[in-house]
Amino acid sequence: MNKIYTETEGIILPKEISLVPYSNEVDYRTFSAVLDDNKMSATYKMYWLLALLEEIQLHNFDIDFKKLISRMVTFAWYPILKYKLSFGLCDNLVKVVNYIEDTYCLESNCDEKKLLDFIYNCEDKILNKMLKDLTYNVPYRFLSPFFREHTRGERSKVEKIIEELSRTDAECVYEIYIDENKRKRIKIRENWCNYLKNNYRILQGWAYYKLVIFLQKRNLNVPGIAMKLEAPKKRNLTAQTKIWKEIIETNHINDIYTGLEFTKENYNEYGVLSMDHFIPWSFVLHDQIWNLVPTFKNINSKKSDNLLNYDKYIDKFCDLQYKAFSFVVDKKRNNQIEEYRELLRIEDAKKFKEEKTIEEFYKMIKKKVMPVYNIAVNQGFCVVEELG
């Protein structure tokens, strides 16, 4: 039986859920074991299934290994480069992604279709060797639940046994064969084509769910794993920018990264007002006011997804946040007050402002921000000394 895990105060607890969608045309019960995570040491099977589902949506039922592996690399691109997620020591998708980025200087936000086409059509011998190495296990092991009786006790011949059986066993998802150009391919059986196509969304969600569980174990304390599996969606910071404009006008604050005033002349030279995330958005995945820093667009672009030197900027950040906190409390901006209340774990923000000193506010902000900052550093986010 598959399990879904629910979070209770940071502890992940198992809760039984039903099997994959029922069917009287395919062996769905055996299929439900293809992503059995008891001994899983890499993301390959989840990404292989996601690649299969995408190809089927495009009405491709006879697919070469390289196309599916190329899709797997494309799917892993954002989680690895944009969100710095660890895939564990046994997962070689990371090596492929890093090789492509280092060799061809492709951006972390590279268009998915262009990236797929580039990987699939690239003639780089080193890259193609790395892609081929990824095909030695997953196409076969994915089918292993269908052939357990035949492979029990085998170690060195499992892939060969599964390949041969896949050609004659009508129950398994696809057959593995070699085409006239000596390329390995799979041909998805018609009944499985219908099942996978008709249940695309459910099975996609199942694969992502299994992926979240796998990655969560290897990225302890990293927030929002489920939201870090795909390219980030465009966000609208209009409301946050409006509030910060009011805070700037009320408090006459300067840009903490450059020390410059927010004047017309500086806007003309350094770009319009822009909201930066002190700890990168691609790590925290939210736009709450306590992590936002007003700066100039050009400066924000320069900072990008990096962290700044903690010791050099944390006091300036705390001072900025105290002014923002005081503003939203005085102006009764309830949404932003709630964000500070959740961060600082306080019941009454107004009472806190009246009774606590600015030094106590600094201390509480640092207590919350420093652990998140350190986890982001350990996750691989770069630290730069300054932006001036």
Residue map of PLM features:
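Mixed-charge, low-complexity interaction segments
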Residues: 2-243, 311-328
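Active-site-proximal segments of catalytic enzyme domains
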Residues: 232-238, 252-254, 260, 268-274
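Short, intrinsically disordered, charge-biased short linear motifs at domain edges
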Residues: 239-246, 280-284
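Short metal-coordination and nucleic-acid-contact micro-motifs, chiefly zinc-binding Cys/His arrays
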Residues: 248-253, 288-292
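Histidine-centered nuclease catalytic patch
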Residues: 259-294, 303-319
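Long, His/Glu/Asp-enriched segments that create or flank divalent metal/ion-associated functional microenvironments
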Residues: 297
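Active-site loop ensemble at the mouth of alpha/beta enzyme cores that anchors a bound cofactor
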Residues: 300
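C-terminal structured domain segments
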Residues: 308-384, 388
